[in-house]
Structures are given as structure tokens and as C-alpha cells.
């Protein structure tokens, strides 16, 4: 079974909302260098506690603010085929996130957006 392993919060001004999440939830932020977009890693708690960490970034052109969950998959290519066969749509094609893996974004048949991540520390 594939699980949600990451979330992303999209906002027009990522720097301005960081204090909110820090003060309300105690989350910490670290800017991620080397990716395709300006991105902050969000740590929501100790790795020994249940839960997931995420990211904070600006929406892509035409995308609204909001939250997207990312699901870990063993093969991004196979999963993208299954999505299209099942009536879903690939919105952002496969791209490398250096030293982390391969990422794509898709919609289910109802239009709900989600991310897919195939871990691969050799991704470039």
C-alpha cells in the first residue's frame, strides 16, 4: 500500500506565513537549495513521533494557494500509467529533485491534485 509521505503548503508569500506555523505549531523551516523552485523544508516534529514533514513554496502559474499531499511510489513511470488508465491526469511531468528522487503531480478523476515521489538519491 502506498502512503502519504509529504505535504506542501502553497502561498504567495512563504516567508510571511512561516512565523504563523512556528508560533502555532512549533514547526521549523529550512530553505532547500538546488531544486527547481524556491522551497522551504518544513519539520513538524521529532522523527520518533508519528506524522510527516513537508514543504512551503509559491504556487505555480495558474495554481491556487492550498495544500497538496505527496505519495511515495516505487516506480513513478508505472504509477503515472495507472493514473492515466484510471481516468486521472498528469499535470506536471516527471522531474528530478536532486539527491532526493523523481517528482510529478497528478489529478484524480474528480480533479483533486496530489504529488508522487519515487525516492532516488541519484536523481539529477
PLM regions with names:
Residues 9, 30-33, 80-81, 85-124:
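Vicinal oxygen chelate
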Residues 54-56, 114-115:
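Conserved beta-strand in the GNAT
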Residues 1, 8-51:
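Core segments of cupin and vicinal oxygen chelate
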Residues 4, 51-54, 66-68, 101:
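Structural motif
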Residues 56-59, 119-120:
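Acetyl-CoA-dependent GNAT
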Residues 40-44, 56, 71, 106:
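Short beta-strand element of the conserved SAM-dependent methyltransferase core
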Residues 63-88:
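Mid-chain, well-packed structural core segment of small domains
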Residues 1-18, 66-71, 119-124:
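N-terminal beta-strand motif that seeds the catalytic metal site of vicinal oxygen chelate
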